[in-house]
Regions:
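Bacterial Sec-dependent N-terminal signal peptides
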Residues: 1-24
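Ser/Thr/Asn(+Pro)-rich, low-complexity disordered segments
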Residues: 21-440
């Protein structure tokens, strides 16, 4: 009898060991640079495909529930990034074109019936019902920044899915319905020369947050200027977005002149979110050359991490990137002026167009050297802090999406070409007296 128990225990242990080996994530080594980029994009795409909300197809806010988010919580801005990732997956033939178009059509049909406020969607939405989930006590209505990231993706999808067949025709038409229904001018709060971030039927303008530059919100003003149905005046850009105490900079940090924004440039997502679709190459106006702005912002962030003035463990030429992310004590927007030792892979990887060599060095370090701790079923985890021996268990839609999209923009310029091909965007940029190679 005793021998039997020992035999049973041995068999059980063998089974557990075999299961552990089977469940261990395969991480191939010695890949070419191209194959590594393929793998990272494809693996990260799983967040927006395998983990998409099963009812609506919207992108879930995060992969864990550390902050009390339920499985029904989806993010509107992250969904826009997810739409762009579906385009990448289609172009690279990870999913079929018809499958992708039908997936996006399901999403768009859901959005047409979901809560919206003067055409704008809430920050968070229940992915099963379409009802608003309050982001905070008074933020229970429209969020035009999140909505802008959604439109960034939807307009790219409209341009990409251009076949003359029932599914793609319907997809384009319904995207246009949503786009044309957005009342940008409402969000000037009765005609002020600035756009306001929030409005709620319960709380009105109580959030009282005018959107002023320079930060991640430039796309809001470009879209509001591009609307054919409810546009805003150019003065809203020039007197609202531009006229702030933190718009112009002009100082030099680590040998790089920063035209706009906070000292040190702020978190790196400032140079990602608006520029997933908006191509900064040759984009300039009377205030800045936006390629110079974004590249120098990235180089300042890189050089700060390499110099590592606070002596955090792990910082190096192949381990850099400060942005908003999860961290050991919550969530924080990291930058050279707010550094807590936490590196987010999305920061360096979404900077591929600006710093390809430095970003590739970081990618190889994250994957080959730290991959046993950072690599996961949805690509890289959100962040890590080697000084604290802390590694996130989470992934966030707004961090995973830019990795896929900006690597693709580095490789092919796909999303840039799609977004900049929109007649409305070209019209809006002309209204702002901007220069771009895309303008005819």
């Amino acid at each position: 009898m005793k021998h039997r128990y020992w035999l049973l225990a041995a068999i059980l242990c063998m089974g557990i060991s075999a299961a552990a080996q089977k469940n261990k994530l395969y991480r191939p080594m010695n890949l070419s640079d191209s194959a590594l980029l393929d793998l990272v994009q494809k693996q990260t795409f799983r967040y927006f495909w395998d983990f998409a909300h099963p009812v609506s197809g919207l992108s879930r806010e995060r992969s864990n529930e550390n902050f009390g988010y339920g499985n029904e919580t989806t993010t509107i801005g992250g969904t826009g990034f997810g739409v762009m990732s579906v385009i990448v997956a289609t172009e690279r033939k990870w999913i079929g074109r018809d499958t992708a178009a039908r997936f996006l059509l399901k999403m768009v049909n859901f959005l047409l019936k979901a809560d919206s406020y003067h055409g704008a969607f809430p920050h968070w939405m229940n992915g099963a019902t379409g009802k608003t989930i309050p982001f905070s006590r008074k933020d229970d209505g429209a969020d035009i920044v999140e909505t802008s990231y959604l439109f960034e993706g939807l307009l790219c999808a409209r341009q990409y899915f251009n076949a003359d067949n029932p599914v793609e025709n319907e997809l384009r038409n319904r995207i246009n319905w949503i786009w044309e229904g957005m009342e940008w001018n409402w969000f000037t709060k009765g005609g002020e020369e600035v756009l306001y971030w929030h409005w709620s039927p319960n709380n009105g303008w109580a959030m009282n947050f005018p959107i002023r530059g320079f930060n991640e919100c430039m796309i809001v003003y470009v879209l509001a200027m591009s609307s054919q149905s409810n546009p805003v005046s150019p003065n809203v850009f020039h007197r609202g977005w531009v006229q702030s105490s933190f718009f112009n900079n002009g100082k030099t940090f680590y040998g790089h002149k920063l035209p706009l924004g906070f000292d040190g440039g702020g978190p790196l997502f400032f140079s990602h979110y608006s520029f997933l679709g908006l191509d900064p190459h040759g984009l300039q106006d009377g205030y800045a050359n936006y390629w110079e702005q974004n590249r120098n912002h990235t180089l300042i962030n890189y050089d700060y991490c390499v110099s590592n003035p606070k002596k955090f463990k792990g910082y190096a030429a192949n381990c850099w990137g400060l942005t908003a992310c999860d961290t050991y004590d919550g969530y924080n927007a990291y930058s050279p002026t707010n550094d807590g030792g936490t590196i987010a892979p999305t920061a360096a990887l979404s900077a591929f167009p600006y710093t390809p060599d430095y970003s590739m060095a970081a990618l190889k370090h994250f994957y080959y050297d730290l991959g046993d701790k950072l690599w996961s079923e949805y690509g890289f985890i959100d962040a890590f802090n080697e000084s604290k021996n802390w590694y996130a268990s989470s992934h966030l839609a707004i961090d995973q999406g830019p990795i896929i999209v900006m690597i693709e923009n580095y490789r092919s310029g796909l999303l840039w070409k799609l977004f900049m091909s929109c007649p409305e965007i070209q019209y809006g940029l002309k209204r702002l007296d901007m220069q771009s190679p895309y303008l005819k």
